Regions:
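Short aromatic-enriched loop/helix-cap "lid" or pocket-rim segments at secondary-structure transitions
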Residues: 30-34, 89, 136
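A local structural motif
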Residues: 68-74
């Protein structure tokens, strides 16, 4: 269904349609289950990506996603790990690092290194930026922003917007032994010139090809 929809859009508007994929839709587990419509909660994401690429590239022998556009939509995978970066590279997709979830420079570098070992494309970086007339004004606007990291077990963390949402998430997945950590989100902030200089610095340090900004 996804391949057919994007092929149709690409046929109607060549060179103007991109397809972006993430591992989770966001929200609480009940919402995710409703969107899954009865499918297994933890399907093989890597195989799903390969199947989607097969339909988009018309490489599936037993099924085809019609129409077949003159120009196929460009594909992007959003992730925050070397595993996601390798998945994108092996499929020939562009990789977008989700720095708005994890802006740790060491993690960005590890993911980009994994991507570049396979792909010649420049990676993208998604982050949050806020510009105001002065740095002081920007600081006032974003000062109260918080992200609540829910720790469910070894290697299992989820970012939520409030302690209440974190507790509700744990309840819906049936976990009673959890921990909630209050953190500040990674935000590029200041006046316009400062935000621009921060983006330039990220570009030089990591070789970012494009930025996706949540503003």
């Amino acid at each position: 269904k996804v391949a057919e929809n994007f092929n149709l859009l690409a046929a109607l508007a060549p060179w103007r349609v991109d397809l972006g994929v993430g591992k989770a839709p966001g929200g609480l587990p009940a919402s995710t289950a409703a969107l899954a419509a009865g499918r297994p909660a933890f399907a093989d994401f890597d195989q799903q990506l390969r199947d989607l690429e097969g339909y988009l590239s018309d490489a599936q022998a037993d099924a085809q996603a019609r129409p077949i556009p003159q120009t196929s939509p460009e594909r992007f995978l959003l992730g925050a790990s070397p595993q996601s970066a390798r998945q994108a590279a092996e499929l020939g997709w562009r990789f977008v690092y989700a720095a708005h979830f994890d802006g740790d420079p060491k993690h960005i570098e590890a993911a980009f290194e994994a991507y570049r070992t396979v792909s010649a494309h420049a990676p993208l970086l998604a982050t949050v930026a806020f510009a105001a007339p002065t740095s002081e004004a920007a600081a006032r606007h974003i000062g109260a922003l918080r992200v609540y990291k829910l720790h469910l077990g070894p290697g299992q963390t989820v970012n939520l917007p409030s302690p209440e949402a974190a507790a509700e998430y744990a309840r819906q997945v049936g976990v009673t032994d959890f921990r909630v950590e209050e953190t500040r989100p990674s935000v590029l902030s200041g006046d316009a010139q400062h935000v621009r200089s921060e983006l330039d610095a990220l570009h030089r340090r990591f070789g970012v090809g494009e930025f996706i900004l949540d503003a």
